[in-house]
Amino acid sequence: MTKGIKKILYLAVTGLIMAAPLNAAVNNELICIDPGHQIRGNSGLEEVAPGSSVKKLKVSSGTRGVATKKYEYQLTLEVGLKLRDALQNKGYKVFMVRETNDVDISNKERAIKTNNAGCTLYIRLHADGINNSSTQGTSVLTSSPKNPYTKSVQKSSDKFSHDILSEYVKATGAKNRGVSYRDDLTGTNWSKVTNTLIEFGFMSNPEEDRKMSTPEYQTKMVNGMVNGIEKYLREK
């Protein structure tokens, strides 16, 4: 064997060894995606948090686009499946809370499913609606430092929320409506996993509603979320 061939083989093997930890790190991350809502709401009640006497509706069907007439549960699944594909193409393992619209999974059950799956990150996909057609923009929701139910993941969830928001805004150009600290969200309170809830935009705004249903904009939405996930994982 010539010295040249030996050198090429050495460099190739060294490169593989050096690359292995990076690929292993990616492959060890399980990302959980929860496309919000479902085709039929469930008006039954469930505890808003473990041991809480406060109860809320299990799950609703969400809002509806004023221009597209598309339901929120349709939009979130549409984008969620594209996010799944994008992450899998990068080597991540993905757990989908739902892959069809005709399901009956409460917000508490969604969180428990992701806890049991052993997820690294849990992202909940939603879209906003309000009685003001001019309001637009994106926001993320997470728990506050004073929330007694989320102490183990509050700080990491706060950072994850900021990372998702900043990268989503950068990719889409959407108006940044900031981080909203909420302690009344069932899915957040039951989660033992670093998590965030993103509101893509307002389906009550005709322009934003139409935009969120275009393939081009959905690609930007997905790219932003992937970038946010990878930013968090790099820096955690």
What are the roles of these predicted feature ranges?
Residues M1-K236:
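Catalytic-site microenvironment of enzymes
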